[in-house]
């Protein structure tokens, strides 16, 4: 069985990868946010 991607990371380092500001910093991240808004997700990204 393979390890999960962010299994041993601290909350801080996970947010640096997948928090709102880091998503909005790149075109692909903005696309991700747009798709999650379109789908009607309650949580767009991880919360602090």
Curated annotation (Swiss-Prot):
GO molecular function list: structural constituent of ribosome
Keywords from the named record: Chloroplast, Plastid, Ribonucleoprotein, Ribosomal protein
Pfam families named in the record: Ribosomal_L34 (PF00468)
Chain intervals for the UniProt region annotation (Disordered): 18-48
Regions crossing the membrane: none
Cysteines engaged in disulfide bonds, as pairs: none
GO CC annotation: chloroplast; ribonucleoprotein complex; ribosome
Cellular localization per UniProt: Plastid, Chloroplast
InterPro entries, A to Z: Ribosomal_bL34, Ribosomal_bL34_CS
UniProt record similarity statement: Belongs to the bacterial ribosomal protein bL34 family.
Protein name stated in the entry: Large ribosomal subunit protein bL34c
Gene this chain is encoded by: rpl34
């Amino acid at each position: 069985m393979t390890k999960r991607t962010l299994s041993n990371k601290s909350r801080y380092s996970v947010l640096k990868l997948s928090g709102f500001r880091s998503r909005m910093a790149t075109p692909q991240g903005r696309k991700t946010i747009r798709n999650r808004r379109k789908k009607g997700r309650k949580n767009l990204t991880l919360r602090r």
